[in-house]
Amino acid sequence: MKKRLLASLIALAATPLCAKDLTILYTNDIHAKVDPYIARYIDEERAVGGFANLATYIKQEKAVQPESTIVLDAGDYFSGSTVDTLTEGEAIIDIMNTMGYDVASIGNHEFDYGWDNTLVQLAKANFEILLGNVFYEGTDKPFWDKPYTIVERDGLKLGIIGLHGKFAFYDTVAANMRQNLEARDEIEYLQKYLDELRPQVDVTILLVHQGTPARQSSLGNNDVRRA
């Protein structure tokens, strides 16, 4: 399912900051496309993408500003190639571990092989994984134990939050793959984590895997802006 996703700069702290350069590179819905492929909506003849090309670009950008570049992903790195299917996502994490990613959130396709597999494979990542609003059903026990992280780049403290849209979770994750899990309102949890982070950081960044009914603009939907 095609989805709009948001990796957005949510807020600057009220304290005045000295001008600094910060480069944020982010991907979403890379769907295990390890090799370049024909994406007809981009080019009907020329193959595009591929993890090697992406890794090269990340390496080049980090070489320019190594102290002020951060690389993020907003989910759906699983599901879309044979190697992913055969390894249930393990090979994708292995490759992403070599590409220079710093932080990623979890999308619906990371649940395609069952949530128990999600836990097993994502635990192998050498970059941070975030998800803050999916819980074991009927409890306050989070499915993933890290809703946000604080990363420093060139003297700036960045608070990064990972969420999954509630509608998108129920609409796109097969019922048998999310059994005994529940997603809760992302706006409520966004506000909670913003309140916790703002006293500690200079900038907050949201990685959210969210469906098209949210109708977000390039700045995010109205609820996100209000938060």
Residue ranges and their predicted role:
Residues 1-19:
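Gram-negative bacterial Sec-dependent N-terminal signal peptides
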Residues 19-227:
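Acidic, metal/ion-coordinating pockets
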